[in-house]
Amino acid sequence: MNKKLEHRFVTELESNQNIVHKICSLYTNDRDSHNDLFQEITIQLWKAYPKFRGESKFSTWMYRVALNTAITLYRKSKRSIKTQDYDSVIFKIKSNEYDNTQEEQLKLMYKAVKQLGDIDKALIFLYLENKNYKEIAETLGITEVNTRVRMNRIKGKLKTILNP
């Protein structure tokens, strides 16, 4: 990867890393797992970046790669992240420590969301990020109608979980 492309990747990732941290919070239960998943998502983004065509916003593309990575790793019963000798640039990215205390109000919601299925988690996450149904559908690769139907079902499930 040339230096200009490398610099653009690092800049984009640093400015959008909170998206990755939020996804990590949805799919992990402890700080070490969170950091491991963050690193794996960063590696997958780095590997896929040369194929990014710019047909969508970087953040939309990043959501898709990050969610697919998180879901894939979440589904594996035994996580075995293979470490390879990647270009050192991906480890130069300054990762702000994610401060869970700033989101105390969302703890109950996250706990409820963690009880949902993989795709439903991704869908509600994008909804909570103020993405519209069209953007959610494009990111997850499902139809807009399916997105609306699933969202209504998810809202019902969350109401049941939060108000037993």
Predicted feature locations:
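Arg/Lys-rich amphipathic alpha helix in sigma70-family domain 2
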Residues: K51, R64-Q84, Q102, R153
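Internal acidic/polar
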Residues: S80-M109, N132-Y133
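Residue-level preference for hydrophobic side chains embedded in well-ordered alpha helices
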Residues: E12, N16, V20, I41, ...
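Hydrophobic positions on the alpha-helical face of helix-turn-helix-like DNA-binding modules
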Residues: I41, V65, L123-I124, I136-A137, ...
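A short, charge-rich alpha-helical start-of-domain segment used by transcription regulators
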Residues: M1-K22, N35
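Structural recognition of an alpha-helix C-terminal capping motif at a helix-to-coil junction
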Residues: D36-I43, K47, S56-N68
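Short amphipathic alpha helix immediately N-terminal
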Residues: Q115-E135, T139
